Amino acid sequence: MTKTIAINAGSSSLKWQLYEMPEEVVLAKGLIERIGLRDSVSTVKFADRSESQTLDIADHVQAVKILLDDLIRFDIIKSYDEITGVGHRVVAGGEYFKESSLVDEYALAKIEELSASAPLHNPGAASGIRAFKELLPDITSVAVFDTAFHTSMPEVAYRYPVPNRYYTDYQVRKYGAHGTSHQYVSQEAAKLLGKPIEETKIITAHVGNGVSITAVDGGKSVDTSMGLTPLGGVMMGTRTGDLDPAIIPFIIDREPDMADAERIRHVFNKESGLLGISEKSSDMRDIIAGKEAGDEKCTLAYDLYVDRLRKYIAQYFGVMNGADAIVFTAGIGENSADVRASVLDGLTWFGIEVDPEKNVFGRVGDITTADSAVKVFVIPTDEELVIARDVERLKTK
């Protein structure tokens, strides 16, 4: 038995889960927030206990040191030597990484180089990797890429209709994201369908603060909503999703300060989506509460969100010439019966029949009637488990 840590590091946070492998037993999990800010919070959950502490954490190295010390302090491990592998979620792997990879200095340099494709994610992941390499230099270090699952997309799906030089010189193309989640839930959906995944057509909807939809044909991603960066596709909590590119010069003509690329990136990534339309919140629970209270901006934000989700799901029926199932996963997908019902209400033409009671009260599994031509599943995602499995697989190579 060995112990593996799955890491999801952001610019100011570090989410982790410790597994006993290959048994896939979760020994502990935790979250460190506000890294680099005052009053950082570290939370550890294990054996039906939850322990939190507030302290100042300067950087990711200090965050990892606190994580490791907590594992000892709470007697979850006796020694650092028990940890033999660490897997890191990395959003953007570009065309360099077609699958999960052992991390050496070359791989780490490439991950940092690809930060332009995931400016909100890759820098944090790189910081997490460097922190573990400094503190536990001898363990197996693996990068698991959100984009890897989508490398099976055909060129017709991933190319943009811009001059060829932008692709050949700068690799401007669709890469997608949330691939680890889409891979996991599509495999689980195939089990629920009782069919080999190679014989299935599944539309997976990862609906959280970030949102992406993927067409999975025969277990392979054939199209996905996020694009060159995680900004593309469906409207999200604070991100625009797809836009007419002419909006950018149009706004710059009227607000010259928007000519700064960093300013545009910030507005479209941090001030848009549900937050931008509602002018209240990026949290769907707040949006629904506002809608129910008669707030017109919250109602519009909700309706726009549902509309964009429905359109992408519908278009992937066309991409695959049908679908056996739709899967909802991630925070909103798993927990908001309202959003699921609203989205599916506009897809009845495909033969979808939702069981209202199952949708409201059934947290996991099939939420359709026995007569539904297309099944709809609610499946909790488990990206950390996929990461731990890839570490175990690459350790034995």
Swiss-Prot record:
Active-site residues, Swiss-Prot/TrEMBL: D146
Keywords for this protein: ATP-binding, Cytoplasm, Kinase, Magnesium, Metal-binding, Nucleotide-binding, Transferase
Cofactor binding annotation: Mg(2+). Can also accept Mn(2+).
Pathway per the UniProt entry: Metabolic intermediate biosynthesis; acetyl-CoA biosynthesis; acetyl-CoA from acetate: step 1/2
Cofactor: Mg(2+); Mn(2+)
Binding site for ATP: K15, H206, V207, G208, N209, G210, D283, M284, R285, G331, I332, G333, E334, N335
CDD domains tied to this protein: ASKHA_NBD_AcK_PK
Keyword Cytoplasm assigned: yes
MF GO annotations: acetate kinase activity; ATP binding; magnesium ion binding
GO cellular component term, pick one: cytoplasm
Gene3D superfamilies (alphabetical): 3.30.420.40
Reaction(s) catalysed by this chain's protein: acetate + ATP = acetyl phosphate + ADP
UniProt KW Metal-binding keyword: yes
PANTHER family the record matches: ACETATE KINASE, ACETATE KINASE-RELATED
Job description of the protein: Catalyzes the formation of acetyl phosphate from acetate and ATP. Can also catalyze the reverse reaction.
Subunit structure: Homodimer.
UniProt family annotation: Belongs to the acetokinase family.
Protein name according to UniProt: Acetate kinase
Organism encoding this protein: Streptococcus thermophilus (strain ATCC BAA-491 / LMD-9)
